Each structure stands twice: as C-alpha cells, then as structure tokens.
Amino acid sequence: MRFFRIFGSAMCLLAAASAAEIKIKVVDPQSAVVAGAQVVLLEVENSSHPVVELTSAEGLAIFRGIGSGPHQVRVLVPGFAAKTTTLSAAADPVTIQLRLAPASETVVVTATRTPVEASSAGADVATLNQQQLQIMNPVAADDALRFLPGAVVNTAGQRGGLSSLFVRGGNSNYNKVIVDGVSVTEPGGTIDLGTLSLAETSRLEFLRGAQSTLYGSDAMTSVVQVWTRNGSTPVPELRFGADAGNYGMENGYASLAGAHGRFDYNVFGNQFNTSGSGPNEDYSNSLEGADVGFSINDQMSVRLRARHDNSVTETPGAWNFNGQNIFHIGGVTYVLSPDLGARARQNNMLASLDLAVKTGSNWTHHFAGFEYNLKTSNIDSGISPENTPFGPINTPFEALVNINRAGFDYQGDYVERTWAETTIGYEFEDENGSVNDPTFALGGHGLRLNEAAYAQQALTLGRLSVIAGGRFVHNTTFGNTGVPRVALGFQALRGGHILSGTRLNFSYATGIKEPRFEETFVTGQFQLPNLNLKAERNRAFEAGFQQNLLGRFVLVANYYNNLFHDQIEFVTVNPTTFLGQYVNLQKSLAHGAEVELQSRLTQRLSWNTSYTYTSTQILLAPPGSFPPNAQGDPLLRRPRHSATTLLTYLGPRWGGNLGGSFVGPRPDSDFDGFGINHTPGYFLLDIGGWYKVSSRVQVYANAENVLNHFYEEVTGYPALGANFRAGMRFRIGGE
C-alpha cells in the first residue's frame, strides 16, 4: 500500500511539472498594458491545435495545464502588427511588446469580425489608431474619414453641416456605421457624420466593399467602425484639456479612466462650440459617455458602454453656388442670401451590454444586448423667403424623426486549427419609429422585427486563403433573402529583398439595404406609403494585387465593379394631383480602380497615399426622369478622380501629421433652376502636431485648409476657409 501511495504522489508531481502555467503580458509601444488582446498559444511539436486566451484589464493572458514546451505565441491586437515569438520553456510573465506597422500588416477586426492581419482579411481596410487621431484632433468623423483611401466626404457647409460619405460610387446611405458594436444609422442607412464625435476614440476602421454578409442591411459599399478607449492604468488617470481658435471655436474635454484587478473603466465628456464664418452658422455638440468592463473569472467577462450626444446646428441653406449668388435668368435678377430661420437638432443615446464567454480552449462566445435612440428635428421658420425660377424657397417646415433600435446579437468564434477559423452569429432587432412634418400634414409610424443568421469560414491552405460566408435575413418589409460572399487570396510570390511578397486577391459579394421609414410608412397629401418595397441590392466584385517592396512599402491596386439594382426612387402616380410614392425602379453601375501606397519609412514615420478612379452611370431610371437623374447620366456628387495622402510622425517628445485630400469636379445640381450642374474640384491641406512639455503636459495645434482655398463639397454650401485651433492637454495620475 505504501508503494502505491509513493507511486501516486510521484505521478501527481510529474503531472504538475508537465502541466505548467504560462503568463503572457502584452504592452503597447509606450509600455502601457493592452487589454482584450487575442493570444494564441501553440505547442511547437503539435502546432495544429491552438489554445486561445484574451488579456485581462492588467494585460495578462494566463494559460493553465500547458505542456512544458517549447511553445509558440502569436498576439493579435487591432491597430498593431501581429507579433509571433517562441518560448523555450514555461516562465513567469513573458512580456510581449507590440509595434506599429504598415497598413497591410496591421491587425484589423471589421473585415472578418475577428482579429486578422489586413493583408489576409479578404477586403480593403484603412485604419486610424489612437495616436493618429490625437494628432488629427478631428471635430467629427467626417474630418478623419476624408483622408482615408476611397472615401469621398460631402459636407453641406461648415461645422455640423449634414455630412455624407460616398464609397465606390454608392449612395450616401450605403454605409454601415457602428460605434462600440451598435449601429448608429437610421433604418435604411441615413447618418450625419458631421455630428458623430470621435472624442475618446481608440481606433477607427474603414472597410470598403459590399459587407452585408457579416453586417446586414446598409453595408452596401462600406462599414465604418469606431471603439471607445478602455482604461488601462492601475492608478486612476484624469485627462483634461481645452483648445480654441478662429470662427469662435471652443473645445473642452475630460476623462477619468483606469484599471484595477478585473475591473476597468473610462468616463468622459466633450463640449465643442463654434460660430462659423457667416450668419446662421453656429454649431454646438456635447458628448458624455462611459465604458466599463469586468472580468468575472478567467472564462467570462462583461462590458457596459453608454454614450449620449446632443447637437444643434444653424443651417443657412444653399445660397452661394461655386462662388456666385446673383443670377440673371429670363430678364429677372435673383439674389440669394443665407437662410436665417433654419436650424437642425439631433439627440441620440446609445447603450450596450456585452457578455464574453470562453468555453474550451478555442471557443469564444459574445452575447450582446443594445439600444439606440435617435431624435432629429429640422425646422425652418420661413423668415428668409427667396424666389427662384422654380418658385419660392426657404418656406416654413418642421421635419421630425424619432427612431429606436433595440435588439440582441450573438457571435461565436471557433479556432479549430491554426489554418481554420469559423464564425457564426444570430441577430434580432426591433426597429420602431416615426417620421413627421406637421406643416405639410405628412407623417407615419413604422415597426419592423428583423432577424438574421450568418456563418463564415476562413481557411489558409498553403499559399491559398479562402473566406466564404452567407447570411439569411428575415425583414418585416422585404421578407426573406440570402446574402453570400467569397474572398480568395493567393500568395503568388514570397519574394526576396526587393519584391518581398506578391499577393493576388479576388472577392464576390452581394449587399442589401432596407427601405427608409419615410419611403415605406409615410403618408400625406402628395405621398402614398409603400409597404411592399424590396431591398436595394448590390452585386459587387473586385480583383487586384498587393506588392511588398523593400520591406517598407506596400503597393495595393484593385479594380471594383458595383451593379446597384432595385434602387428606390419617388415616382408620381397621379400627374393631376402630384400624388406619388417610392418604388424600386432605378438601376445603376459604378466601377473603377483604387491604388494605394502604404509605407513605414521609419518606426516613427508613416506615409500613406492613394488615388481612386470612379465611373458611374444610371442604367435605368423611373419614367419621366430628367437630367441630372435621367437614364445615362452619371450619379451626382461622385467624382471621377480623388486622392488622399497622410504623413504621420509619432515620437517620444512630439508628433505631427500632414494630410491632403483632392476631390475632382463632380456632377451636382442646385435643383432650383439656376442651371448649376457641377461642383468644381478642390485640394484640401491640413496639418497638426503636439509637443510634450512634460510627462503630464502637452501643447498642440491644428490648422485646416491651410491654403485658404474657397471650395464647396456640396454645391451652394461654402466650406470654411483657413481655420486653426490650439490648446493644452493635462494628465494627472495614470501610473
């Protein structure tokens, strides 16, 4: 009996020795801990079965019951380069420091809903990390997006003006915008990017192409996703600052963030005001938010996020067309001036609760509940009426929108092998809202209960990578439909010193967009509702290559082709009473090419530049359509030629950037009979930078449109001339 006790004890000691515990600590280039990093551990002798953990609020990933090694560790953190290292033996915390990298090597999450290197994502993704956003200091999302490849931003006027995004020839409501995991677009894709604050944003990703397989309705040509910064310091860190500039610009902000044990938090607020450059151009925006996370145990964590945003914009309307506000037509002189009685207000509230559960060594589940409420009002008192060849404008109106989106999401990620990963998901959403204009007795209330299920398989088979997925959608308005997507990548040349890798890419996808509430449910004197509208669709494919050069440069070139059909347009059904309704009648084509050069000249200096060519045409228009919306016409506000450049330096004592955006001439219209049919091209140059006075004090400055060019992104709405802001940031605590 004694022999068996000794033998059993020996076996237990042997098992304990062979089942080691490995701790991995992940830090960023400034040595700050990184929470939520995906750490994949492999036994070198059995590399086909990975074990996956996420780092805690303290930046630690702990692997228990692991063999004695050797092991290989791979760390994937969005916004940084993937990091792979080999551990010769189990050790106490092994610190892995991340680094910045060219865009193609940066880890992204939007393309596949899981962390993946951009070069293997099967889609084109541009990113802005926290350091870049801090230098750019954007007032709103449109200020940052206009310097990213393939993005054409059209803002109607100055700060707070209605701002739209056009990607690959698609409409402005063909983009899905997600904040902290919650869609912030109205049903049908409408969003104002000019009022979407990026205060306390840790990362922005801009994904181009049809992405409805993973993201559902509205992701017809792109997805924009932003995340709030998490707290990461054991000692609470208070950040606050303010800046001011010309045109009455004033900006103040503060945040309190930190992490202790299993708990992390960030509570923040921001206030921005400006008087603009002319009459009735004031704008103010206030933002409050919180991001709180708690690790219940090593296998389960929960995160609560909330944001409230309130903005007021004075809207002078279209009055200066390409520098001209006096027109002589038919012997009549028309003098246009700003509308002094119009303003827009927006109030929105976002909340989400995400539960992450890890089961087994390679299954991760996310259960999320969310709610988003949006209230907008566009009011014109009519105190500035003006005549046009088509009649008076600036007549009184009151457009009111109240939208609520609430629902539940599930996402499961299974890493079955080093070369295979599966993602599955289910979504339920309740869309409830009303659209009204009491002035014209126009309005309606709508309710949709939508469901969707999706699956995606990612495979790496030698030099070939395959990402294939599908989504089944049930929508109350347009019924059931399927949405497939497949992306192929082939490593044609692994390369040497000069040509350090050649990759060929191809993808085919479909996109869908549900009708807007005002298209489906609204009724009035001149409009009938249409409860039988179909989804707008996009058949999209793209093909291109990625070429690495000298280990510092990456050349990316793609051809894209989008065929939009079942597009919704308003059609008059009774010419006598002018009664009409929205119907699925339009079809259009957009195709072109994108060329991008990504480079990391040094570890601290990066430079990205891009050129986009876009050709569009209306293939089928509703009966009675006339220019500029007739069959054969190009789509409005889509330039044939556009280009961007962004040079960024990030050093220990100072940082700076230089951003340029060129947008060529594009078709447009005044819609009032003045004969305006285009908007001239323009070049916009912005600069920004900061200097560290001490470890706790920074001074910074930003200048936009430094060349002081007169330009309009939307005809009739002059943009700001040269404008600047300067201020100081302070930090207390945070060790």
Task: Show where each model-derived region lies.
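Short acidic/polar hinge/loop motifs at secondary-structure boundaries
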Residues: 182-210, 227
